[in-house]
């Protein structure tokens, strides 16, 4: 058990809280592997460059990540008072979410399983 009063513990926990602007999408209906193709392309890029990359990327995940980038940029501007022209993608990752299991009927009464995978996508921005 931690020593100290509950309010003191909360104060200490909030002191080390990450204040970088971010956006997170949970339960995105795209697999982690497919989302990572787009995320790898924008990692470390400036915000304008990252938005240009996802805008012209034909993958389905890029439309989801474009919304996330715009949301994180709005969070940076409105909540943190950061300049949008100085922002860059510091972190972006996709974690595994739950899997929906579906059945695909096959010949002679068999059934194959289809796994519809989900992911939790996070984008973290910062100022240069």
Curated annotation (Swiss-Prot):
<comment type="function">
    <text>This protein binds specifically to 23S rRNA; its binding is stimulated by other ribosomal proteins, e.g. L4, L17, and L20. It is important during the early stages of 50S assembly. It makes multiple contacts with different domains of the 23S rRNA in the assembled 50S subunit and ribosome.</text>
</comment>
<feature type="region of interest" description="Disordered">
    <location>
        <begin position="1"/>
        <end position="20"/>
    </location>
</feature>
<dbReference type="GO" id="GO:0003735">
    <property type="term" value="F:structural constituent of ribosome"/>
</dbReference>
<comment type="subunit">
    <text>Part of the 50S ribosomal subunit.</text>
</comment>
<dbReference type="InterPro" id="IPR005727">
    <property type="entry name" value="Ribosomal_uL22_bac/chlpt-type"/>
</dbReference>
<dbReference type="GO" id="GO:0006412">
    <property type="term" value="P:translation"/>
</dbReference>
<dbReference type="InterPro" id="IPR001063">
    <property type="entry name" value="Ribosomal_uL22"/>
</dbReference>
<comment type="similarity">
    <text>Belongs to the universal ribosomal protein uL22 family.</text>
</comment>
<keyword id="KW-0687">Ribonucleoprotein</keyword>
<protein>
    <recommendedName>
        <fullName>Large ribosomal subunit protein uL22</fullName>
    </recommendedName>
</protein>
<dbReference type="InterPro" id="IPR036394">
    <property type="entry name" value="Ribosomal_uL22_sf"/>
</dbReference>
<dbReference type="InterPro" id="IPR018260">
    <property type="entry name" value="Ribosomal_uL22_CS"/>
</dbReference>
<dbReference type="InterPro" id="IPR047867">
    <property type="entry name" value="Ribosomal_uL22_bac/org-type"/>
</dbReference>
<keyword id="KW-0689">Ribosomal protein</keyword>
<feature type="compositionally biased region" description="Basic and acidic residues">
    <location>
        <begin position="9"/>
        <end position="20"/>
    </location>
</feature>
<comment type="function">
    <text>The globular domain of the protein is located near the polypeptide exit tunnel on the outside of the subunit, while an extended beta-hairpin is found that lines the wall of the exit tunnel in the center of the 70S ribosome.</text>
</comment>
<keyword id="KW-0699">rRNA-binding</keyword>
<keyword id="KW-0694">RNA-binding</keyword>
<dbReference type="Pfam" id="PF00237">
    <property type="entry name" value="Ribosomal_L22"/>
</dbReference>
<dbReference type="GO" id="GO:0022625">
    <property type="term" value="C:cytosolic large ribosomal subunit"/>
</dbReference>
<dbReference type="GO" id="GO:0019843">
    <property type="term" value="F:rRNA binding"/>
</dbReference>
């Amino acid at each position: 058990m931690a020593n100290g009063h509950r309010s003191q513990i909360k104060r200490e926990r909030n002191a080390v809280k990450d204040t970088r602007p971010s956006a997170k999408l949970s339960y995105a209906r795209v697999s982690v592997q497919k989302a990572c193709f787009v995320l790898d392309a924008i990692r470390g890029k400036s915000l304008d460059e990252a938005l240009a990359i996802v805008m012209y990327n034909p993958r389905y995940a890029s439309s989801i990540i474009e919304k996330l980038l715009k949301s994180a940029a709005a969070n940076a501007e409105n909540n943190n008072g950061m300049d949008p022209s100085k922002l860059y993608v510091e972190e972006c990752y996709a974690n595994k979410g739950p899997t929906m299991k579906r059945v695909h009927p096959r010949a002679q009464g068999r059934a194959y399983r289809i796994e519809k995978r989900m992911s939790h996508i996070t984008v973290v921005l910062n100022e240069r």
